[in-house]
Amino acid sequence: MSSRKGTRSSRIVTLERSANSSLSNNGGGDDSFGSTLLETSRLQEKDHLTSLNSRLATYIDKVRQLEQENNRLQVQIRDIEVVEKKEKSNLADRFEAEKARLRRALDSAQDELAKYRIEYDAAKVEVKKLKPQVEKLERELAGAEEQALHAQSIADQSQAKQKTLQARNDKLVVENDDLKKQNITLRDTVEGLKKAVEDETLLRTAANNKIKALEEDLAFALQQHKGELEEVRHKRQVDMTTYAKQINDEYQSKLQDQIEEMRAQFKNNLHQNKTAFEDAYKNKLNAARERQEEAVSEAIHLRARVRDLETSSSGNASLIERLRSELDTLKRSFQEKLDDKDARIAELNQEIERMMSEFHDLLDVKIQLDAELKTYQALLEGEEERLNLTQEAPQNTSVHHVSFSSGGASAQRGVKRRRVVDVNGEDQDIDYLNRRSKLNKETVGPVGIDEVDEEGKWVRVANNSEEEQSIGGYKLVVKAGNKEASFQFSSRMKLAPHASATVWSADAGAVHHPPEVYVMKKQQWPIGDNPSARLEDSEGDTVSSITVEFSESSDPSDPADRCSIM
């Protein structure tokens, strides 16, 4: 399983390699034992071999049973891996499809939102543009309404006055006939008076001017001719009296004519002004009513337009809120699904860890049984060699089990040294050769190799930091035996915090989906002896590596004696 505990980590996997080497120490024998010792030794060997054969058969059956159980567990593990990969693939496909659908829906919603925002901005601009006109029209409408109310009040007053005047008119119709006659007379009189007034005014002006001139002349004459004035004073008084009387008589007659004429003209002007005022008032009232109706209709239209724009704006806002609510709901739903998937994956990983632990335990048991079988094989080969039943037997047998992802360590197992005594009195000391493999993992920096598949299908690189890391130009190299394969990331490749990128072999059947999944072209990760993997940065420096080291040691203890089955 993967581990993310620091920037520099080291993981060691220890595996036993068992081999048998015989170190023989010759003991002294005495030829005096004779045939009795030989027969006794052969009987003991027969009983011992019978017991060993029985135990060997039991161990063979147990080994076969464990191999069958191992095969069954491997089949179960492969089935679980297939189901997990299928579920991951299906879940990833469904997630990508749903993600694409949501992205399309989000793009559509954003397009509609942009369109609605444009319409809303245009509507706001139009509303701002129309708002002064509406306010002006409302003011004009208020003024028109006030004028209409004032005109209505005036009209009501006029109607009341009209009724009163109509009543009075009926009463005055009779008087009108008399007044018409008097009007004609008075009109003539007014005309005469007007003319008289005009003439009298002219005469008065002329007289005043003349009087002033005469007064000036008189003053001058008085100053120069005081004496003559006294002489002609009496005569001048008579002349002035006569002249004043004549002027007064003319003035009185002309004034009366002018007054009559002015009265007639005033009445005519009054009637004309009244008629013109009523016509102008009616025309203005009709025009005001028409403007009022137009202003009311335009105000109603503008208010309806404003209401439509406000309704459209509120509808767009509600649509945006609804889309945001749906998007939040979908995000929460997918987050819950992702949490459920992560929980399921964690459960599967725990199950896999448990099964792998059981598998390793069974593997340890198998190794112990292999060691026990090797021990008994050595004993049987010693007897066969002693009895000259075979000439040669293999001395060392080693079984390699190397895995990149092994997480624990298998301890050495051994007990007391076994000693075999042959018929010649020679004893054999058996030492066991232990071979260990050590898996070292080193990481410098936040990015490193996280895990390597045992079957050589994929290699995972992970970012263990809280920040985004660029791995553009990084090169991943895996070696096993004489084989080597490499993969280089693109120059724009970046890893999100705690994210990983998995590089699959070309024949693994994975789908290329950057930046999480990469599939190599015509290359496979190698499998073989002495496997190693390293991650190089863009400058060629190694930032993470995994290597396997082997070590051998001899141990006189027998691993089989610690077998729980024994």
Curated annotation (Swiss-Prot):
Residues 541-556 have a biased composition (Polar residues). Residues 95-228 are annotated as: Coil 1B. It is a lipid-anchor. The keyword Lipoprotein applies. The modification N-acetylserine is found at S2. Residues 1-37, 528-566 are annotated as: Disordered. InterPro entries: IF_rod_dom, Lamin_tail_dom, Lamin_tail_dom_sf. It comes from the Eukaryota. A lipid is attached at C563 (S-farnesyl cysteine). PROSITE patterns: IF_ROD_2, LTD. One of its GO terms (molecular function) is structural molecule activity. Residues 45-387 form the IF rod domain. Residues 435-550 form the LTD domain. Residues 386-566 are annotated as: Tail. GO terms for cellular component: lamin filament; nuclear envelope; nuclear inner membrane; nuclear lamina; nuclear periphery. GO terms for biological process: determination of adult lifespan; embryo development ending in birth or egg hatching; germ cell development; heterochromatin formation; nuclear envelope organization; nuclear migration; nuclear migration along microtubule; nuclear pore localization. Residues 257-385 are annotated as: Coil 2. Residues 564-566 form a propeptide. Belongs to the intermediate filament family. It is the only lamin protein in C.elegans. Interacts with LEM domain proteins lem-2 and emr-1. May interact with unc-84; this interaction may be required to complete the connection between the nuclear lamina and the cytoskeleton. This is Lamin-1. The gene is lmn-1.
